[in-house]
Design a protein with these regions (language model features):
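N-terminal export and membrane-targeting signals
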Residues: 1-7
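Non-catalytic accessory regions flanking glycosidase/transglycosidase catalytic cores in CAZymes
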Residues: 15-148, 172-189, 300-303, 307-462, ...
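Active-site cleft segment of glycoside hydrolase catalytic domains centered on the general acid/base Glu
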Residues: 55, 115-238, 242, 255-269, ...
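Catalytic-core region of carbohydrate-active enzymes that cleave or remodel glycosidic bonds
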Residues: 222-290, 295-315, 350, 362
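Short beta-strand elements bearing conserved aromatic residues within extracellular beta-rich modules
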Residues: 369, 498-500
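A short beta-strand element within beta-rich, extracytoplasmic domains
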Residues: 468-492, 496-498
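Extracellular carbohydrate recognition and processing domains
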Residues: 502-535
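Short beta-strand-plus-loop segments that form exposed binding edges in beta-rich domains
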Residues: 540-549
Length: 562
């Protein structure tokens, strides 16, 4: 059915989109509770393994709209030849581009070897390669986006016990070797191919007993999303049973070879990662370097790219979504309380299905509802735009609205935008600090903050590789000078300063006069930034490469561009 025909089959009455005809009826319902925010938007699953090939592939303009969180890239001096391709994607060589688009990087250390599964040589060889990688990274004083050393990859599949000995003991040797040179960069692992409680228990127990626990726990989800929630719950219970403090979770490979190019199943993974509190997740690598694993083809978007563009458009807070089951229809949603816009992205089911929104009272009694879809185009087919299914004004009853979408394909992705019929700014003006790319600082909650959260512990270690900064990816309609208002708190009793730079340009200084208390907001300062039309990256830094460092301390609530 064409988009026009499908749209004509939809009638709106009493706040419900009613479908005509006899579409096949899956009749699943995904519930979105807009009044139940559970974490700031941080686009945790917008990332990829071997996502970048060089310093410009894919092009920046294809990456900025996606608000990339974390990438896992091969080791410095990469030797890995996946699928027979020449080595590429060296984490340090692509770091300038990753930085330009706001993305953090993990370094996958065993990818210094050419083969997969890795072919063990000797302990002398491996430890020398570890030293080389760490030394290369430490010498890269202009690189500040490296946020993890991944010590090995899929040891439950690739570790050669006969030649190299027990993996748990090997982990300790490698961990200690890295820490002998780099005491600050987080360590990521064990990065197993699958989640297995018995395997993980053995690893964690040994790591706990040898004081070599990873800072970030990592495993892969490559066998559908049905068990993701159970795996996360099992891991958290395992931590508690072993007396281990909660670690950040990274799923740095997700989706099967078939699913990776299907927006519907991918939406289900993202939903479960968001609800499960995962820190970051990366699309699995199955085919080619430098496409974010099928999101781009010849620097043009595929169908899957649009799913991540919808994800990138989210701001404010993720809100609770409840599927009927762990298989089939699922999705994720966000509410931007400043603009009063709700985004929901979903898929994984065919036929006629429903998305029920509750907690919409803050949007008013009448809203505009837009429904879009994007197909499973495959990784080599360009999709120039999503298909608009409907764009309608709808009444909201008791804060509720149900959108019925007929003729869904289980492989396609779907997007619903709910917003007031008037009063929405023509472009996003306020950008919450907690939604930005945050390096070595932390998110906190506060009832006085703009959207209930802010960024604090913005520090300067004296080393630009490991100091704190916040990168705001903004999108403006025209090239001109914008007034940038910054919401902040500074309870030091004296003026604090940050460095300000945008689009990699020169540094200036922002001064923050003292305020009454930490975590209490309302104070603002303003400055001017000259931005190009489209996407820009604005950095506020306590410390960063090529910046001498800020003074005092300030917490960031938001920036606003007018």
């Amino acid at each position: 059915m064409s988009a026009a025909t499908l749209a004509s089959a939809i009638t709106v009455a009493a706040g419900v989109i009613l479908t005509g005809g006899t579409a096949s009826a899956a009749n699943s319902t995904l519930t979105v509770n807009v009044a139940s925010p559970f974490r700031p938007v941080s686009h945790v699953a917008a990332g990829g393994l071997y996502a970048l090939a060089e310093n410009n592939r894919p092009a920046d303009n294809m990456l900025l709209p996606l608000k990339l969180n974390t990438l896992t890239q091969p080791a410095p001096r990469v030797g890995q030849r996946p699928n027979g391709q020449p080595p590429g994607g060296d984490a340090l060589l692509v770091a300038p581009q990753a930085t330009r688009v706001g993305a953090a990087e993990y370094i996958r250390m065993p990818d210094i070897y050419p083969n997969f599964p890795y072919r063990w040589v000797s302990w002398n060889d491996w430890l020398a390669k570890v030293d080389t990688q760490v030394n290369d990274r430490l010498a890269a004083t202009g690189t500040s986006n490296i946020t993890g050393w991944e010590l090995w990859n899929e040891p439950d599949y690739t570790w050669d016990t006969a030649a190299a000995g027990d993996f748990n003991a090997a982990w300790v040797r490698t961990y200690q070797r890295v820490r002998a040179r780099d005491t600050l960069t987080p360590i990521v692992g064990p990065s197993t191919a699958t989640y297995n409680e018995s395997w993980m228990r053995s690893f964690l127990t040994h790591a706990r007993n040898t004081d070599t626990l990873p800072d970030i726990i990592c495993w892969h989800e490559l066998q559908t999303s049905a068990n993701v929630a159970a795996h996360i719950a099992n891991y958290r219970a395992l931590e508690r049973s072993l007396g281990i403090s909660a670690r950040r979770i990274s799923i740095n490979e997700y989706a099967t070879p078939t699913e990776i190019d299907q927006p519907g199943p991918v939406a289900s993974y993202i939903a479960k990662f968001e609800r499960g509190g995962v820190d970051n997740a990366e699309r699995a690598f199955w085919y080619e370097y430098g496409t974010v694993n099928g999101l781009t083809t010849n620097n043009q978007p595929t169908g899957s790219w649009w799913l991540y563009k919808w994800y990138g458009d989210m701001a404010g807070n993720m809100v609770t979504t409840t599927p009927r089951a762990q298989t089939g229809l699922d999705g994720f949603a966000a509410h931007d309380p400043t603009r009063r816009i709700v985004h929901a992205v979903f898929g994984g089911e065919s036929g006629t299905n429903h998305v029920r929104f509750t907690g919409l009272s803050s949007l008013g009694g009448q809203v505009r509802v837009t429904v879009e879809s994007t197909p499973a185009s495959g990784r080599h087919t360009q999709v120039s735009a999503p298909t608009t299914i409907s764009n309608t004004t709808v009444n909201v009853t008791n804060g509720e609205l149900t959108v019925t979408v007929p003729n869904m394909s289980a492989t396609s992705g779907y997007h619903i935008v709910v917003q007031p019929t008037s009063g929405v700014p023509g472009y996003q003006q306020r950008y919450e600090a907690e939604n930005a790319s945050i390096f070595r600082a932390n998110r906190f909650g506060s009832s006085s903050a703009s959207a209930g959260a802010y960024v604090g512990q913005i520090d300067n270690t004296g080393d630009p590789r490991t100091a704190s900064y916040v990168d705001f990816i903004v999108n403006v309609p025209t090239a001109r000078a914008y007034t940038m208002q910054i919401g902040y708190a500074n309870a030091t009793g004296a003026t604090a300063t940050h460095g300000l730079a945008y689009n990699g340009g020169s540094w200036s200084t922002v001064s923050y006069p003292p305020t009454s208390a930490w975590g209490q907001f309302g104070a603002t300062v303003s400055t001017t930034v000259n931005l190009r039309a489209g996407y820009n990256v604005i950095r506020l830094a306590k410390g960063a490469p090529y910046f001498g460092g800020g003074t005092g301390y300030a917490e960031l609530d938001y920036i606003e561009l007018t």
